[in-house]
Regions:
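A secondary-structure capping/hinge motif
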Residues: 198-202, 246-256
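Catalytic-pocket segment enriched in acidic/His residues
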Residues: 190, 194-195, 202, 206-222, ...
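Extended amphipathic alpha-helical scaffolding segments in membrane-proximal extra-membrane regions
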Residues: 177, 195-196
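Alpha-helical bundle regulatory/interaction domains
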Residues: 1-171, 177-179, 184-189, 203, ...
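Residue-level "edge-of-site" marker
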Residues: 210, 245, 261
């Protein structure tokens, strides 16, 4: 099983965090369950392998569309996979569903909505088919980038301060003083929070909390043993009780239970580095 990440070209870097390809060379001999901590990035996914299912706070078992738009995930979720895995994806910046596609981000939180229903333009189906049929990994990534470039040239979107604020929260892993962002925005608190919710789908503070827990999960991913005081120090929690409370709220388990029981993808593949397209 292989998981690869690629960085976007400069013109799209305001909207795209990365592209990824996740695939298995052979069919799985039994159902595989992969879980993920809360996701602080929306995305677009093209499945060219076997159909699979999702379990999250909203859906006990959802048949995931072959191509879909994914909003933020505020709690841990699980994927149930069988057969051959073949998934190509675009990881978007936190506010990009709104900025790039003009979508109401809050409507997509915890959702996997069919791409053909969300974006009805004929070119969407054309690129989706090309991505499925492309044989090479780089070919699939280039087609995803071409798809976004096509849309970008049609709409010519511009980012604003909310995009910047959301990116700062994501890049700092939720470890920042919200007052600094508010002061820099030159907006009232109510206006800032309303505009942030409209473009990202969550309040700034809640988004920062999710991002920080995602960072913690990444620190312990694939490990069998960790130094917990060091982890909550790195994540800037004031005390262990606060750390455990937040972790349980967003994952449903204590940190030690999660470490022992989780089936994150990092347990099955090497942690990827982000490559440039050549």
């Amino acid at each position: 099983m292989q998981y690869q990440k690629f960085r976007p070209q400069e013109i799209l870097s305001r909207f795209v965090e990365c592209y990824f390809i996740w695939e298995s060379q052979q069919a799985l001999d039994k159902e595989m369950i992969i879980e993920s901590p809360p996701s602080s990035y929306p995305g677009i996914v093209f499945n060219y392998g076997e159909a699979y299912f999702l379990q999250n706070k909203k859906y006990p078992r959802l048949a995931v569309p072959q191509q879909f738009v994914a909003g933020l995930s505020t709690y841990s979720f699980k994927l149930f996979l069988s057969g051959r895995i073949g998934i190509a994806g675009i990881v978007l910046k936190p506010a990009a569903l709104s900025t790039l596609f003009g979508l109401e981000s809050f409507e997509y939180t915890e959702e996997r909505m069919d791409l053909f229903t969300v974006l009805k333009e004929p070119y969407v189906q054309t690129y989706t088919e090309k991505i499925r049929q492309a044989e090479g990994t780089v070919d699939k990534v280039r087609l995803m980038e071409d798809f976004l470039l096509h849309h970008y040239k049609l709409t010519r979107p511009e980012t604003d301060y909310i995009d910047h604020a959301a990116n700062v929260i994501a890049e700092s892993n939720g470890m920042l003083h919200m007052h600094d962002l508010l002061k820099e925005s030159c907006m009232s608190r109510r206006t800032f929070e309303r505009r942030f919710f409209r473009k990202v789908g969550l309040s700034p503070k809640y988004y920062a909390r999710i991002r920080r827990i995602g960072y913690v999960a990444n620190l312990i991913a694939g490990k069998k043993k960790v130094n917990w005081p060091e982890v909550f120090y790195q994540a800037e929690f004031f005390d262990q009780a606060h750390f455990i409370k937040d972790f349980e709220e967003f994952t449903g388990r204590s940190p030690q239970q999660y470490l022992k029981e989780n089936t994150e993808l990092a347990n099955f593949v090497e942690k990827p580095t982000t490559q440039s397209l050549q």
